[in-house]
């Protein structure tokens, strides 16, 4: 992947706890049941193209890789999770020492992707794969949506110039930045 330089947006921030609480409770369950080292394989796919267009465009790899490279539970994260009362100390210690050992395969950025076909595969300890799920879904779902729309607009323009005005309608500054980056 190529490096990113951006002064507007800190794309290297730690998104480890930007997850559904469910992912944490499932991971804690895996640890409690002795599945910490059990290897799992998760495939990400989509069921249908929302606009009936037949295909989507793969996008989001760079953001996903940057986020995965930054995964680390801080003491502040651990203390917050402890305060919920939902997790035992064994799980919190696991998170404190968390290191990703997964293999991740994905369709190349910019390629057409189709319903019911894997676009990202994650293989590794089940507990680690589970902790990646929300990050994977939120990153690729948004980026593929925007890339697909941009692809369709550019194809319809048939070589005429196209201008991007997405920031004013984007769902937050991240969406505006990453949409414009496509």
PLM regions: where:
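Buried, small/hydrophobic-residue-enriched core segments of structured protein domains
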Residues: 6-39, 48-50, 86, 92-101, ...
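An N-terminal, globular interaction/scaffold subdomain
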Residues: 69-71, 106-109, 113
